């Protein structure tokens, strides 16, 4: 267990090394604001804390809280389509049972997540609840078990509200790739929420649920968090068990989480993280109580980030990045400087190599992982004259276009004669990316960049241009290749929609240093006094 905060300072070990060639960051701009809603702007507050306190005091019941969220979900879901399945009856029963236990004085009834409504991305297995992966090939599939992350949430008292929409098997950046529906962005329903965890991000943004789980293979938590104006966390590879997560690219897949505040996100991570005997890649490192290390706004010093060294990656602010995004990130960097940190530009020359390497490696692993969906072991079965036809027709009818394309790309990269030219070289690039991040993180406590090169774009804008869509992952894939933790916190707005479109700041750190990211993210979030990240969909009086 790490030591408690002392004198309310950020606990980051700072290594003094010889000064490398780099440029001091300078920016006159401040964090961009926009008239986001009619609500008064101010720091994000913890919904989890509020729910817990109201249950303990008897001010509210779990049934009341569940009814409130279900009511909001029913009003907004026809527009957003965030959920593939809503378990409303089960949620109401669980809430009533929680109230009964509290009333009878059972001391363990109010767990850390008691009464907290959670959305679960539909590529995480949930017992006796549809788990489709966003694919027709698993339509109607109901697992007999919970994914480890889901089980731990339930054990902490959380109520699973339903399964959120996603790009099929996590392959996409818009949630348009779902076999069932297209999710829209709560900030502008003509725009995408990002992906592949777009349903989870949109649901938290619209307050359809308190928090949600997602998965992140190349940015699938962080990019939609940026597009929807919520907090998104991709933990270190191995920090959270992958048992029960439908495999896309097993060396890259990570279970992540969304919240409307850093505190809520930290609370969820503490619950779901930790070693799991069902996942050999899960880490046995001790899991801190991340939320307890966060300092309330009234206790913050005037320069709470004194001594913290932050590197802003030069390659993420150049060609191909929207000017409004660059301005927001530079404004966020200036804000971090005002809080006492030293912000300098740092170059990662291998940064641009990560994107092609990622798509080769991820597609190669997907071509193997998805071979299990053959119409016999998993998936809907079609009538056929022989076994080969059964395999072919089941997969042709069950998989969508993007999934088929990535399977073909991965099979090609692994085939004889091309393995060395593609897969082997991509693995070599991955090693290079890991080393470049390791070197940079020996000089800086945290690295920052945009979470995406643009804000949310129009539905249909890139669906027929896969290269343009893939290029949108440039900011996030390197973190997965390196296995590092990353946190996205809303930092500003760009023009678009009726009230502006949110932009997210990505913070990256060393392995298993989620606590550092959460502490910096919390301080950053709590000192953004002039911004509100509640979407216009939830106008005053409709919350």
Swiss-Prot record:
Q: Which GO terms describe its biological process?
A: glutaminyl-tRNAGln biosynthesis via transamidation; mitochondrial translation
* EC numbers on record: 6.3.5.7
Catalytic site: 121, 196, 220
Give TM segment ranges.
Answer: none
**Signal sequence range:** none
Q: Which Gene Ontology terms cover its molecular function?
A: ATP binding; glutaminyl-tRNA synthase (glutamine-hydrolyzing) activity; hydrolase activity, acting on carbon-nitrogen (but not peptide) bonds, in linear amides
Q: Which GO terms describe its cellular component?
A: chloroplast stroma; glutamyl-tRNA(Gln) amidotransferase complex; mitochondrion
Q: Where found in the cell?
A: Mitochondrion; Plastid, Chloroplast stroma
Record's catalysed reaction(s): L-glutamyl-tRNA(Gln) + L-glutamine + ATP + H2O = L-glutaminyl-tRNA(Gln) + L-glutamate + ADP + phosphate + H(+)
- Does this entry carry the keyword Iron-sulfur? no
Output the Pfam families linked to this UniProt entry: Amidase
What HAMAP family does UniProt report for this protein, alphabetically? GatA (MF_00120)
One further remark on this entry is: This protein may be expected to contain an N-terminal transit peptide but none has been predicted.
**Known role:** Allows the formation of correctly charged Gln-tRNA(Gln) through the transamidation of misacylated Glu-tRNA(Gln) in chloroplasts and mitochondria. The reaction takes place in the presence of glutamine and ATP through an activated gamma-phospho-Glu-tRNA(Gln).
Descriptive protein name: Glutamyl-tRNA(Gln) amidotransferase subunit A, chloroplastic/mitochondrial
Gene that produces this protein: GATA
